[in-house]
């Protein structure tokens, strides 16, 4: 039976085995999907051993995405742009192909919620790996402007310069933010620490869409804050998790699974339905 893994540290909390098992059942694919939690300095050895022993593909999560980028034999265009790899496939000719499905998963989830991206003004909070992975897929949807805000302004400026060939990308400090945004995406991990980005509530209005890449069994702090100031549409990253997994499954198996029922099952599993 074809074997797949998710590599991370920590990774015991991962919902990837649950999701991919449902995808396999739905598409009648025979495979098994497990967890691997190597020490940070043992990732390369463990990854190579997995493929040497017949592994077909894997997902890679924190803190290994940048290491995976350096270890694979070839990169998809979107992985090159993201500077990180979250999906690896062993091709028929023995090549380890690195891909990044995070941004595609984000865009698919936004669209499933009816969020219009073309012609919109988007604010992206954070300039780390999650933001980098999201930029090219978001800009491919042709927003009028994408603004990056980050506590360290230089990081936002660097990211904006790197992606300016794909669209109108601006780097601003949190204090400089103004005007009306149609969508705010929080790519920071602030919600995991129970914290908020230093954002003015004046940016929140009834018609704005709010998206937090983090998720939990309750509203994240960022979503709760946005709702408190009048945001009517606020979404967490659970749908992105399922959509990026569907994209990875498609890369591996050549068949695209449906996501709606799997997301429903996952919410039930987490106790959020």
From Swiss-Prot:
Active site, renumbered: 65
Chain sites annotated for binding shikimate: 14-16, 61, 86, 102, 215
Keyword NADP on entry: yes
Disulfide bonds: none
CDD domains: NAD_bind_Shikimate_DH
Documented EC number(s): 1.1.1.25
Metabolic or biological pathway: Metabolic intermediate biosynthesis; chorismate biosynthesis; chorismate from D-erythrose 4-phosphate and phosphoenolpyruvate: step 4/7
Domain of life: Bacteria
UniProt KW Oxidoreductase keyword: yes
Key words of the record: Amino-acid biosynthesis, Aromatic amino acid biosynthesis, NADP, Oxidoreductase
Binding positions (NADP(+)): 126-130, 150-155, 213, 237
One GO BP: aromatic amino acid family biosynthetic process
GO MF term set: NADP binding; shikimate 3-dehydrogenase (NADP+) activity
Recorded GO CC terms: cytosol
One Pfam family per UniProt: Shikimate_dh_N
InterPro entries: Aminoacid_DH-like_N_sf, NAD(P)-bd_dom_sf, SDH_C, Shikimate_DH, Shikimate_DH-bd_N, Shikimate_DH_fam, Shikm_DH/Glu-tRNA_Rdtase
Catalyses which reaction(s): shikimate + NADP(+) = 3-dehydroshikimate + NADPH + H(+)
Function: Involved in the biosynthesis of the chorismate, which leads to the biosynthesis of aromatic amino acids. Catalyzes the reversible NADPH linked reduction of 3-dehydroshikimate (DHSA) to yield shikimate (SA).
Subunit architecture: Homodimer.
UniProt similarity note: Belongs to the shikimate dehydrogenase family.
Name this polypeptide is given: Shikimate dehydrogenase (NADP(+))
Protein source organism: Aeromonas salmonicida (strain A449)
